[in-house]
Swiss-Prot record:
Entry's Gene Ontology BP terms: ribosomal large subunit assembly; translation
Primary role: Binds directly to 23S ribosomal RNA and is necessary for the in vitro assembly process of the 50S ribosomal subunit. It is not involved in the protein synthesizing functions of that subunit.
This protein's encoding gene: rplT
Keyword tags: Ribonucleoprotein, Ribosomal protein, RNA-binding, rRNA-binding
Pfam family, one: Ribosomal_L20
Organism annotation: Porphyromonas gingivalis (strain ATCC BAA-308 / W83)
Entry's family note: Belongs to the bacterial ribosomal protein bL20 family.
The keyword Cell membrane appears for this protein: no
Protein name: Large ribosomal subunit protein bL20
NCBIfam families: rplT_bact (TIGR01032)
């Protein structure tokens, strides 16, 4: 009895991976083994960068808050300490947005915690 191989499924799997690697440079787009390795490496980069995106955005928000707070004569750490001491629960993302897009609202918050 001849060996049973499922060529239909094998071909479909290869086509699926090669379709996902369309647009890559050189052999990465059309050579099966290279494309498969590139695709798998891309998945690891995506996983890693989903984690680092959170760190990067937090650092960006802190930089923006610090810059805006220093314009008001207060450092970032003193501002955050004063916010917590006054029981104002506002997260860094919103504070950074206020600092960039609504400076008058940010100024009002800083004035409230300065007193």
């Amino acid at each position: 009895m001849p060996r049973s191989v499922n060529h239909v499924a094998s071909r479909a799997k290869r086509k699926r991976i090669l379709k996902l690697t369309r647009g890559y440079f050189g052999a990465r787009k059309n050579v099966w083994t290279v494309a498969k390795n590139t695709w798998e490496k891309g998945l690891t980069y995506a996983y890693r960068d989903r984690k680092s995106k959170k760190r990067n955005f937090r650092a960006l928000w802190i930089q923006r808050i610090n810059a805006a707070a220093r314009l008001e004569g207060m450092s970032y750490s003193r501002l955050m300490g004063a916010l917590h001491a006054n029981g104002i629960e506002i997260n860094r993302k919103v504070l950074a947005d206020l600092a960039m897009n609504h400076p008058e609202a940010f100024r009002a918050i800083v004035a409230k915690v300065k007193n």
